Amino acid sequence: MEPIHNPPPQTCSYSRPSTTYTSFKDASCGTKVTRIIIALFLIVISCGLILCAYTFRDLLDADYSAQEGPQQATKLLQQLDKVLTGPPLPIWDNEHLFQFSCLMQNKHRRVLPIDICNPLTKFNFLEYICNCLMTKQSVNVNETDMCELFCPPTCTPENYRRLLCTSSVFPFVMWHDPSADTQEAMLTKMDQTMSSGRVGNSHWVLVIVDIEHRCVTFFDSFYDYIASPQQMREQLEGLAASLGAIYPKEGGADSDQEELLSPFQVRIGSTVKVQSPGEFTCGAWCCQFLAWYLENPDFDLEEKVPTNPSERRALLADFISTTEQAMSRYSSLSWPTTD
């Protein structure tokens, strides 16, 4: 029996196709055209990616001009109202308010500086203002003994008495945080704000009592942060009636008693919102309003404040820069003297 010999397995051999690279110079005409088309296509794609990465702000700054109608430009300014450039304006707190009121007392003499040792809120300002004006009335008629006269810690009783006698304009500042719904909660919130060093939602508003003009003026740089103007007017009308009884009009013996005890006039000075969102300038705006009032009690706020937000900001920045140095003389918080 013969041995069986299996044939060797057949193998398949694959050969790679050879690729020949030719330079652009040696390539055929069709290859050159193809390469040019591919290069142009890649350039277009690259330019598209660059334009996609180009920010909209850069496109606005590009060297070209477009004619836009006045309505579109107005809308753009309205949008920019919330985007104000420049360094932040300094925050004026109660110490700055006191220093500025001392500066105004030195200039106008009829102004009583702001007592910052007794914090006022929307819960106690009516009673406090009435008590302050009643104290002035009793001092004028020599009914208050020196020992009974309450005066701020940084002012002597003798000096405080003289200031009360010579003052006819009484500015008061109220501190407010919308999260507090009682006087105790408001004072607690005030302590927390002072400890943290952050402004938070706190806000200053101004009340001016003018005995000579028989007027109570309220100012809120946010216009309606504490309450609506109508709600504030209703509260202030109660104060105005009390002040009318404390300081009756001068008249003869035959004058009508009801007319003599007529209430003070109530004026809501914050007719527009002057403080821009994101800025903590309520204290500085209160001081600016007080300065305008002392120059002319009948001034119109809308005539003083520009409608353009950038111009408003520049106006307040100029006011701050021109008064801060003069205010520094009262940095010790000592009350000015009448000598």
From Swiss-Prot:
Alphabetized GO MF terms: cysteine-type deubiquitinase activity; deNEDDylase activity
Keyword Protease (UniProt): yes
Keywords: Hydrolase, Membrane, Protease, Secreted, Thiol protease, Transmembrane, Transmembrane helix, Ubl conjugation pathway, Virulence
BP GO terms, sorted: protein deneddylation; protein deubiquitination; proteolysis
InterPro entries per UniProt: Papain-like_cys_pep_sf, Peptidase_C48_C
GO cellular component, one term: membrane
Protein name per Swiss-Prot or TrEMBL: Deubiquitinase and deneddylase Dub2
Organism: Chlamydia trachomatis serovar D (strain ATCC VR-885 / DSM 19411 / UW-3/Cx)
Gene assigned in the entry: cdu2
